[in-house]
């Protein structure tokens, strides 16, 4: 499945290179119009990242996210700076279908497991951003990639499997924003090892060939941000390559 994405800083559509706030590109686009266009081209799911909130949780762009969600009929998945049960509940009450939890799942797993028990595994997606070291270990980074987490991807997945983990978005940081192609070997390995989890691929998508390669890897969906913003291809073409379920 194709999941078009936009990243937001202070209400503007942006892209970061490898998660670095110092390497930001701002696009002269309306977030609402951009998401509406993606929906009109056939997207059933849309992914919104609140980068302001990810960096400074007190400045989460909840009002904007509420407006965006209200104006769209597609399913919305939202991440960035979510730290409390109240924030999860608020987003779900605004009509967001799934919240994306990153750093906190690594730092405070018991807290986040409680949210799975309260809201259900369909309502939460874990975002695991990984650095693959020379030994091939998949180490999860935390805090908007500004610091290393030290835990392996597998250890986190196995921990959260106890509460019914269903959705996980995995980004190979070395590919993010690079347009060098996705790490399809990674998604092939994960979907074969953990077939009950719907893996979302992210990072490096540049061409429809990349989309097809991820489709064939066993991943359940693909997050596409930069490639759409710079018109490498459009959502309709991507869905033609990988139709909605």
UniProtKB/Swiss-Prot annotation:
Top enzyme class: isomerase
Entry GO MF terms = 1-(5-phosphoribosyl)-5-[(5-phosphoribosylamino)methylideneamino]imidazole-4-carboxamide isomerase activity
Q: What is its main location?
A: cytoplasm
Q: In which pathway does it act?
A: Amino-acid biosynthesis; L-histidine biosynthesis; L-histidine from 5-phospho-alpha-D-ribose 1-diphosphate: step 4/9
Q: Which InterPro entries match?
A: Aldolase_TIM (IPR013785), His_biosynth (IPR006062), HisA_bact_arch (IPR006063), Isoase_HisA-like (IPR044524), Isoase_HisA-like_bact (IPR023016), RibuloseP-bd_barrel (IPR011060)
Q: Which residues are catalytic?
A: 7, 129
- EC number(s) stated in the UniProt entry for this protein: 5.3.1.16
Catalytic activity annotated for this protein?
Answer: 1-(5-phospho-beta-D-ribosyl)-5-[(5-phospho-beta-D-ribosylamino)methylideneamino]imidazole-4-carboxamide = 5-[(5-phospho-1-deoxy-D-ribulos-1-ylimino)methylamino]-1-(5-phospho-beta-D-ribosyl)imidazole-4-carboxamide
Which keywords are on file for this protein?
A: Amino-acid biosynthesis, Cytoplasm, Histidine biosynthesis, Isomerase
The record's Gene Ontology biological-process terms are: L-histidine biosynthetic process; L-tryptophan biosynthetic process
Cell compartment(s), UniProt: Cytoplasm
One GO CC term, this protein: cytoplasm
* HAMAP family, A to Z: HisA
Entry similarity comment: Belongs to the HisA/HisF family.
What is the protein's given name? 1-(5-phosphoribosyl)-5-[(5-phosphoribosylamino)methylideneamino] imidazole-4-carboxamide isomerase
**Which species?**
Shewanella sp. (strain MR-7)
* Gene assigned in the entry: hisA
């Amino acid at each position: 499945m194709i999941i078009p994405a936009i990243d937001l800083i202070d209400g503007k559509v942006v892209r970061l290179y490898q998660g670095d706030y110092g390497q930001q590109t701002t696009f002269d686009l309306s977030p609402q119009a951009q998401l509406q266009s993606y929906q009109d081209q056939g997207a059933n799911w849309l992914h919104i990242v609140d980068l302001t909130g990810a960096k400074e949780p007190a400045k989460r762009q909840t009002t904007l996210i509420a407006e965006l969600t209200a104006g769209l009929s597609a399913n919305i998945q939202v991440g960035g700076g979510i730290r409390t049960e109240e924030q999860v509940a608020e987003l779900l009450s605004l009509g967001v279908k799934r919240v994306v939890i990153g750093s906190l799942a690594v730092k405070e797993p018991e807290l986040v497991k409680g949210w799975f028990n309260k809201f259900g595994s369909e309502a939460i997606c874990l975002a695991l951003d990984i650095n693959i070291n020379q030994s091939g270990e998949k180490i999860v980074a935390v805090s908007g990639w500004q610091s290393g987490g030290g835990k392996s991807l597998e250890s986190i997945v196995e921990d959260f499997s106890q509460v019914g983990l269903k959705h996980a978005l995995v980004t190979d940081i070395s590919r993010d924003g690079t347009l060098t192609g996705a790490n399809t070997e990674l998604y092939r390995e994960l979907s074969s090892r953990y077939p009950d989890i719907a893996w979302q691929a992210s990072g490096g998508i540049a061409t429809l060939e990349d989309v097809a390669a991820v489709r064939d890897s066993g991943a359940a969906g693909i997050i596409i941000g930069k490639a759409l913003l710079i018109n490498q291809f459009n959502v309709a073409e991507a869905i033609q390559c990988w139709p909605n379920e």
